[in-house]
């Protein structure tokens, strides 16, 4: 299935049903009074994380999503049915953004987590609600409020513990093949990897972590060169980054310049991402003699002014890959647990809880006590409105 990590959709919550103006009409009960019921609330639109989904491709072709409208109220104090909520299933790791205001509405990071993205309209009130000691035959009602309408930008950010950074052909895909069962395409030309790949690494029985491989970066990626930086967002949730450096580039470029270019593009994209824990991993060590390898690694580390962890591996021959995977596992386990405060059942305060109270108070306040049409004999000869 094609990997799609971005989609723009339009969601419309259901409008609230209107209240009903109706009067009780029964034999031998000439002055039955009002019995118009309230309308139903409109359905809301939710996003729900589902681990059985792994792409947003379905939302590229189905862009408009509407919840049900609430039914109008009826006579005999019958309340209209509330509209059915619409639940849209998205992959775990999806971020919802208001496309007009760029406001981040929320991240769905756990299976089953729900996010309200469009609230249904509040129901209208029937004329029974306006009955009072001075207004015993009210003909007032309120309409349901419109449901929220939003244009949403959905972004899928892969959930991984370790992210791989590097120039094209640095050996990132070969490394992920060496430490996991992932099988990304590997070839001797740039940009072999066109979409992110995930692999599960099991350094020890029963203990594992997830590693993400993204397409390679080149200098100028922030301005759109190569595949740009659109895939860097998939590293935002990683807990550590591995900067893979080709110690013996086939095109003769200096590894120092390549490493600086990657760091520069990372800082342009997000200083927060650039500040994540990062290890330097020199790949293709099998192409050099041991003394030459040590000398070259020492030169690159010195010129970069690097003071962090440094590792030397050969992803092709798998030299050093198992040891590196074990050290990654130990590092991840040493980190404090992530704060997962997502509550799928959390209630959202209703935006229009007190919407109608002002209308009721205003009508009762403006009502003229001296004009009580309840005592007019014609009051109960008016046409009664029944809503089916």
UniProtKB/Swiss-Prot annotation:
The cofactors named for this UniProt entry are: Mg(2+)
Assembly, in brief, is: Monomer.
* Cellular compartments per GO CC: cytoplasm
Which residues belong to any copy of the OBG-type G domain? 160-333
Q: Which UniProt keywords apply?
A: Cytoplasm, GTP-binding, Hydrolase, Magnesium, Metal-binding, Nucleotide-binding
Where does this protein reside within or beyond the cell?
Cytoplasm
A GO BP entry is:
ribosome biogenesis
Family according to the record: Belongs to the TRAFAC class OBG-HflX-like GTPase superfamily. OBG GTPase family.
Q: Recorded GO terms, molecular function?
A: GTP binding; GTPase activity; magnesium ion binding
| EC identifiers of the protein | 3.6.5.-
Q: Which CDD domains match?
A: Obg
Q: What is its main location?
A: cytoplasm
**Function of the protein:** An essential GTPase which binds GTP, GDP and possibly (p)ppGpp with moderate affinity, with high nucleotide exchange rates and a fairly low GTP hydrolysis rate. Plays a role in control of the cell cycle, stress response, ribosome biogenesis and in those bacteria that undergo differentiation, in morphogenesis control.
Show the Pfam families listed in the entry: GTP1_OBG, MMR_HSR1
InterPro entries linked: G_OBG, GTP-bd, GTP-bd_Obg/CgtA, GTP1-OBG_CS, GTP1_OBG_dom, GTP1_OBG_dom_sf, OBG_GTPase, P-loop_NTPase
Q: Where does Mg(2+) bind?
A: 173, 193
Q: What is this protein called?
A: GTPase Obg
Which residues are involved in binding GTP?
Answer: 166-173, 191-195, 213-216, 283-286, 314-316
For the Obg domain, which residue ranges apply? 1-159
């Amino acid at each position: 299935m094609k990997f799609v990590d971005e989609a723009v959709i339009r969601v419309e919550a259901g409008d609230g049903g209107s209240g009903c103006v109706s009067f009780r009409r029964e034999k031998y009960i000439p002055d039955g009074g009002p019995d118009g019921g309230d309308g139903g609330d409109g359905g809301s639109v939710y996003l729900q994380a589902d681990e059985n989904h792994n792409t947003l491709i379905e939302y590229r072709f189905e862009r408009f999503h509407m919840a049900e409208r609430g039914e109008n109220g009826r006579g005999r104090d019958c309340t209209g049915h509330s509209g059915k909520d619409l639940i849209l299933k998205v992959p775990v790791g999806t971020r919802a953004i208001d496309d007009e205001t760029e406001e981040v509405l929320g991240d769905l990071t756990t299976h089953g987590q729900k996010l309200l993205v469009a609230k249904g309209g509040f129901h209208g009130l029937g004329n029974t609600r306006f009955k009072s000691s001075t207004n015993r035959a009210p003909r007032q009602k309120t309409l349901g409020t419109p449901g929220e309408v939003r244009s949403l930008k959905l972004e899928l950010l892969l959930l991984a513990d370790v992210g791989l950074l590097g120039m094209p052909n640095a050996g990132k895909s070969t490394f992920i093949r060496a430490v996991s069962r992932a099988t990304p395409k590997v070839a001797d030309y740039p940009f072999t990897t066109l979409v992110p790949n995930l692999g599960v690494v099991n350094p020890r029985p029963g203990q594992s972590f997830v590693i993400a491989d993204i397409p390679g970066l080149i200098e100028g990626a922030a301005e759109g060169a190569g595949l740009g930086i659109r895939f860097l967002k998939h590293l935002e949730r990683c807990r550590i980054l591995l900067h893979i450096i080709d110690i013996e580039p086939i095109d003769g470029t200096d590894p120092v310049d390549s490493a600086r270019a990657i760091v520069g593009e990372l800082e342009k994209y997000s200083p927060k991402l650039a500040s994540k824990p990062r290890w330097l991993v020199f790949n293709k060590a099998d192409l050099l003699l041991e003394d030459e390898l040590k000398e070259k690694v020492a030169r690159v580390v010195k010129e970069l002014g690097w003071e962090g962890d440094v590792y030397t591996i050969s992803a092709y021959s798998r030299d050093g890959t198992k040891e590196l995977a074990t050290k990654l596992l130990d590092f991840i386990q040493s980190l404090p647990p992530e704060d997962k405060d997502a509550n799928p059942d959390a209630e959202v305060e209703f935006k229009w809880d007190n919407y109608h109270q002002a209308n009721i108070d205003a009508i009762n306040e403006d009502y003229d006590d001296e004009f009580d049409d309840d005592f007019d004999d014609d009051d109960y000869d008016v046409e009664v409105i029944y809503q089916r």
